[in-house]
Amino acid sequence: MNFVTTIGLEVHVELKTNSKIFSPSPVQFGSEPNANTNVIDWGYPGVLPTPNKGVVEAGIKAATALHAEIEHHTYFDRKNYFYPDNPKAYQITQHEKPIAHDGWIEIEVDGKKKKIGIEEMHIEEDAGKNTHENDYSYVDLNRQGTPLIEIVSKPDIASPEEAYAYCEALRQRIQFTGVSDVKMEEGSMRVDVNISIRPAGSDKYGVKTEMKNLNSFNYVRKSLEYEEQRQQQVLMAGGKIQQETRRFDETTGQTILMRVKEGSDDYRYFPEPDIPAVDIDDDWIASVKKTIPEMPGSRRERYINEFGLTAYDAGVLTQTKEMSDFFDATVAEGADPKLASNYLQGDVNAYLNEHKVDLLATDLTPTNLAGMIKMISDETISSKIAKKVFKAIMAGSEPVQWVNDKGLVQLSDPAKLQPIVDDVLDNNQQSIDDFKNGKDRAVGFLVGQIMKKTRGQANPKVVNQLLMTSLKAR
């Protein structure tokens, strides 16, 4: 029996602002518990929220990146529920008039492109954090009031692989706008998943199950793979799917029942009386749009068409805005695009992974990387010497000056190399005889001897040309 899978995702993205959405408390990850709070965050009676204009502008940016329609007249609502990490007993969110709706992003799976619709995007405040330890429960309200956007997809996702691709495409586009760092390890991006299956040919959606607060795209994919299989087995055995909230166990790779939902939650939404509606006119939207940088898809096309990079290389370079900007700046400094791409993906990426640092936290700059690459292109240095130059750059040296100070300029002058070639040949008659007898490896040995005498500074291309001419003349 064949089944059709339907998946919807709700992605919560923490916005990168200096202060919270309705209070002046700072937004800082890793602070001492309850250090970044005030009376508004604590929900004291009589205190009033003040909307953060920067949050609305971040919402406009994100909506634009998601090709969404921006609501010109939007307002906030109260979502009523009680929990210790929510001291007001309600959350300020958007329900009736979210800031944006009807957007889309494009994904690619197995070489096939597909548009995934976005139902809506709304702004809301985050809740605090509960920690349970021994016989005590602790409440940390540092996160309370942190601005979020929640992006709700349409039920257009048809497989766990598509869900993974959607999350990755969404992460890239949001990160490129600069409204969030989307660091999942710090909770800046969390995903709620909904999945249902139905027999092929049926138009009626199946009963969905949900899993909340997944903080890894791999967990999103693995939880959906397991749940897809589980639901198929239940239906094929003649059972029925219940509407459930389940938890994904990272250790076992299984989903575990948390609770059965007999109906939809009633949060008794009503308009937030303490915050006026927000009117967003076309001029405001236009001014915000001007600050949005080139998106990853456009950059990938430019890298392929303008620089001749492969689709794979263009994809790697646009994984983050940081790397993409660095590449563009390096090429603007005169570096060969393909060499710049190779170094960023190779030596640079290996260094970042080994030392566990961000690119912008190193001594590498587009100027000094381009300086090294230009010396490779004009054969001032060899690729072998470039390895040493790269290490020197990462230790804080300027590449051109360092190469000159160390006397590592590549020797390319035939007039200076010919005597060295002759000397090596004079002392290696056996290798000359081997070459004349068709043993090509003799050439490699002779090149190695020449490179040894020049301490690796001889231009290999020139050496090979001189050597072959000299061998044939003997």
Swiss-Prot record:
One of its GO terms (molecular function) is glutaminyl-tRNA synthase (glutamine-hydrolyzing) activity. Belongs to the GatB/GatE family. GatB subfamily. This is Aspartyl/glutamyl-tRNA(Asn/Gln) amidotransferase subunit B. GO terms for biological process: glutaminyl-tRNAGln biosynthesis via transamidation; translation. NCBIfam families: gatB, PRK05477.1-1, PRK05477.1-2, PRK05477.1-4. Coiled coil: none annotated. Disulfide bonds: none annotated. SUPFAM superfamilies: GatB/YqeY motif, Glutamine synthetase/guanido kinase. Heterotrimer of A, B and C subunits. Transmembrane segments: none annotated. It holds the Pfam family GatB_Yqey. It comes from Lactiplantibacillus plantarum (strain ATCC BAA-793 / NCIMB 8826 / WCFS1) (Lactobacillus plantarum). It catalyses: L-glutamyl-tRNA(Gln) + L-glutamine + ATP + H2O = L-glutaminyl-tRNA(Gln) + L-glutamate + ADP + phosphate + H(+); L-aspartyl-tRNA(Asn) + L-glutamine + ATP + H2O = L-asparaginyl-tRNA(Asn) + L-glutamate + ADP + phosphate + 2 H(+). Allows the formation of correctly charged Asn-tRNA(Asn) or Gln-tRNA(Gln) through the transamidation of misacylated Asp-tRNA(Asn) or Glu-tRNA(Gln) in organisms which lack either or both of asparaginyl-tRNA or glutaminyl-tRNA synthetases. The reaction takes place in the presence of glutamine and ATP through an activated phospho-Asp-tRNA(Asn) or phospho-Glu-tRNA(Gln). Its EC number is 6.3.5.-. PANTHER family: GLUTAMYL-TRNA GLN AMIDOTRANSFERASE SUBUNIT B MITOCHONDRIAL AND PROKARYOTIC PET112-RELATED, GLUTAMYL-TRNA(GLN) AMIDOTRANSFERASE SUBUNIT B, MITOCHONDRIAL. HAMAP family: GatB. Keywords: ATP-binding, Ligase, Nucleotide-binding, Protein biosynthesis.
